[in-house]
C-alpha cells in the first residue's frame, strides 16, 4: 500500500474563497454568510409590516380597519392574519388565491404569511450571525444559544400554534392591540394563565428582570476605583485588564442579606443566562401543547361543588366563568362565518355593556 504525502493546493481564485473573503471582511457592519439570510429576510419582514400597517385593510379577513390610512394609530394598526377559509395556505403572490394580483393578495392577508415567514428566517439568521461571529473571534456560542429562546417563542406562537388549529387565522396579527386580543383569546379558550408552562415562563422572565436589577445595582455598589473622566463612559477603557468592582465585597454583602451568595462570576452569569432562556423555552413548549389543544390544570371538584352549592366559590371558579364569557363574546365576533348564536341569557353583562 502506497501513501502519498503532499500539500493540497487550492486555486487562489476559487469562487468560495472570494465570497468568503468578501463576506467576512472586517468592516463597520459585519455581513458574513449568515447575512445572506438575515439581511434580505429582515428587510422584507420589516418592510412588509410597515406596508401593511400603513395601507392594507383587514376588512376582507376580519371585518376590521387596521391601517393608518383608515384612521388607526400605532397601537391599533396591524398586519392581520388571513381568513379562516384560507386554512394553512402559504398565500404566495403567484398562487391560486391571488393569481399574481398584488391588491387581491393584500386583501386576502398575504402580507401576514409574508411577514411571519420572513420574520422567522430573519430571527434564525440573526442567531446564525452570533454563531458565526463567535466562531470568528473564538468565543463560546452562548449568545446564540440564549437567542434561541425568543426564536422558540416566535415560532411556537406565530407558526406552530396556528398549524395545530384550523388555519393561520388563529395566529396573532402583527400589531400591539391585535396581540393583546390574542392574549385574551388564549386565556378564554385555553385558560393560559393556569398553564404550568406559562407559569414557568413568567417566573423566568420576571426572575431574569430581578436578577438583572440586583446584578447591576450590586456592581454599582461595589465600585472601588474612580477614573479621571467626567463619567463612567469616559473614565474607563473597555479593554482594560483590571476590574473596578469587588466580587468579594458583593459576596459578603449578599451572604449577610440572604445567608447565601454566588461564589464566583461564572456561576452567577450562567444563572442569569439559564433563568430567562429556560423560561422562554418552557413558554414555547406550552404553546406547542395548546396547538394540540392540551388542557391546563382543571380543578373539576371545585367546579362541581360550585355548581351544586351557590355559596361556594373560589378564584378558580370565578375565572372559569370569566373564560366562558370571553368565549361567548369572542367566538361570535371573530368567527362570523361559523354563524355562532348565543342566547341573550348566557351572554355576560356588566356596567360597560
Curated annotation (Swiss-Prot):
Tell me the residue numbers annotated for binding a plastoquinone: 215, 262
Q: List localization entries.
A: Plastid, Chloroplast thylakoid membrane
Cellular component GO terms held in the UniProt record: chloroplast thylakoid membrane; photosystem II
How are cofactors bound according to the entry's free-text note?
The D1/D2 heterodimer binds P680, chlorophylls that are the primary electron donor of PSII, and subsequent electron acceptors. It shares a non-heme iron and each subunit binds pheophytin, quinone, additional chlorophylls, carotenoids and lipids. There is also a Cl(-1) ion associated with D1 and D2, which is required for oxygen evolution. The PSII complex binds additional chlorophylls, carotenoids and specific lipids.
Q: Which SUPFAM superfamilies match?
A: Bacterial photosystem II reaction centre, L and M subunits (SSF81483)
Sites where the protein binds chlorophyll a PD2:
198
Q: Which GO terms describe its molecular function?
A: chlorophyll binding; electron transporter, transferring electrons within the cyclic electron transport pathway of photosynthesis activity; iron ion binding; oxygen evolving activity
Q: What cystine linkages occur within this chain?
A: none
Q: Keyword annotations for this protein? A: Acetylation, Chlorophyll, Chloroplast, Chromophore, Electron transport, Iron, Magnesium, Membrane, Metal-binding, Oxidoreductase, Phosphoprotein, Photosynthesis, Photosystem II, Plastid, Thylakoid, Transmembrane, Transmembrane helix, Transport
Q: Where are the transmembrane segments?
A: 41-61, 125-141, 153-166, 208-228, 279-295
* Residues annotated to bind chlorophyll a ChlzD2: 118
Positions that bind pheophytin a: 130, 143
* Annotated positions binding Fe cation: 215, 269
Modification Phosphothreonine occurs at: 2
Membrane topology is: Multi-pass membrane protein
EC number of the protein: 1.10.3.9
Where are the N-acetylthreonine residues found in this chain?
2
**Miscellaneous information on this protein:** 2 of the reaction center chlorophylls (ChlD1 and ChlD2) are entirely coordinated by water.
| Assembly information from the UniProt record | PSII is composed of 1 copy each of membrane proteins PsbA, PsbB, PsbC, PsbD, PsbE, PsbF, PsbH, PsbI, PsbJ, PsbK, PsbL, PsbM, PsbT, PsbX, PsbY, PsbZ, Psb30/Ycf12, at least 3 peripheral proteins of the oxygen-evolving complex and a large number of cofactors. It forms dimeric complexes.
Q: Which family does the record claim for this protein?
A: Belongs to the reaction center PufL/M/PsbA/D family.
Identify the PANTHER family for this entry.
PHOTOSYSTEM II D2 PROTEIN, PHOTOSYSTEM II PROTEIN D1
Function statement: Photosystem II (PSII) is a light-driven water:plastoquinone oxidoreductase that uses light energy to abstract electrons from H(2)O, generating O(2) and a proton gradient subsequently used for ATP formation. It consists of a core antenna complex that captures photons, and an electron transfer chain that converts photonic excitation into a charge separation. The D1/D2 (PsbA/PsbD) reaction center heterodimer binds P680, the primary electron donor of PSII as well as several subsequent electron acceptors. D2 is needed for assembly of a stable PSII complex.
**The protein's name:** Photosystem II D2 protein
In its UniProt entry, the species of origin is given as Carica papaya
Taxonomic lineage from the root: Eukaryota, Viridiplantae, Streptophyta, Embryophyta, Tracheophyta
**Which gene carries the instructions for this protein?**
psbD
Amino acid at each position: 500500500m502506497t501513501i502519498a504525502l503532499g500539500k493540497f493546493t487550492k486555486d487562489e481564485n476559487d469562487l468560495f474563497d472570494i465570497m468568503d473573503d468578501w463576506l467576512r471582511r472586517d468592516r463597520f457592519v459585519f455581513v458574513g454568510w449568515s447575512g445572506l439570510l438575515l439581511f434580505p429576510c429582515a428587510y422584507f419582514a420589516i418592510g412588509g409590516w410597515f406596508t401593511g400597517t400603513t395601507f392594507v385593510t383587514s376588512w376582507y379577513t376580519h371585518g376590521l380597519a387596521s391601517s393608518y390610512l383608515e384612521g388607526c394609530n400605532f397601537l391599533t394598526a396591524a398586519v392581520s392574519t388571513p381568513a379562516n377559509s384560507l386554512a394553512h395556505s402559504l398565500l404566495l403572490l403567484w398562487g391560486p388565491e391571488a393569481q399574481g394580483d398584488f391588491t387581491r393578495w393584500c386583501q386576502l392577508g398575504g402580507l401576514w404569511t409574508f411577514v411571519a415567514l420572513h420574520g422567522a428566517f430573519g430571527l434564525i439568521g440573526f442567531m446564525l450571525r452570533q454563531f458565526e461571529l463567535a466562531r470568528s473571534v473564538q468565543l463560546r456560542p452562548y449568545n446564540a444559544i440564549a437567542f434561541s429562546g425568543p426564536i422558540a417563542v416566535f415560532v411556537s406562537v406565530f407558526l406552530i400554534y396556528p398549524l395545530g388549529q384550523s388555519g393561520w387565522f388563529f395566529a396573532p396579527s402583527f400589531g400591539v392591540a391585535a396581540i393583546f386580543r390574542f392574549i385574551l383569546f388564549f386565556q378564554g379558550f385555553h385558560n393560559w394563565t393556569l398553564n404550568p408552562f406559562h407559569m414557568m415562563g413568567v417566573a423566568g422572565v420576571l426572575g431574569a428582570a430581578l436578577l438583572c436589577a440586583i446584578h447591576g445595582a450590586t456592581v454599582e455598589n461595589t465600585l472601588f476605583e474612580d477614573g479621571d473622566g467626567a463619567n463612567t463612559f469616559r473614565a474607563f477603557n473597555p479593554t482594560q485588564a483590571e476590574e473596578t468592582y469587588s466580587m468579594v465585597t458583593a459576596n459578603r454583602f449578599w451572604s449577610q442579606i440572604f445567608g447565601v451568595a454566588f461564589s464566583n462570576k461564572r456561576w452567577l452569569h450562567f444563572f442569569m443566562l439559564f433563568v430567562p432562556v429556560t423560561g422562554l423555552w418552557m413558554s414555547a413548549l406550552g404553546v406547542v401543547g395548546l396547538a394540540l389543544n392540551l388542557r391546563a390544570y382543571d380543578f373539576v371538584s371545585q367546579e362541581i361543588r360550585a355548581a351544586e352549592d351557590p355559596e361556594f366559590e373560589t378564584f378558580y371558579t370565578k375565572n372559569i366563568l370569566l373564560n366562558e364569557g370571553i368565549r361567548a363574546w369572542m367566538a361570535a365576533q371573530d368567527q362570523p362565518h361559523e354563524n355562532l348564536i348565543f342566547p341573550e341569557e348566557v351572554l355576560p353583562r356588566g356596567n360597560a355593556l
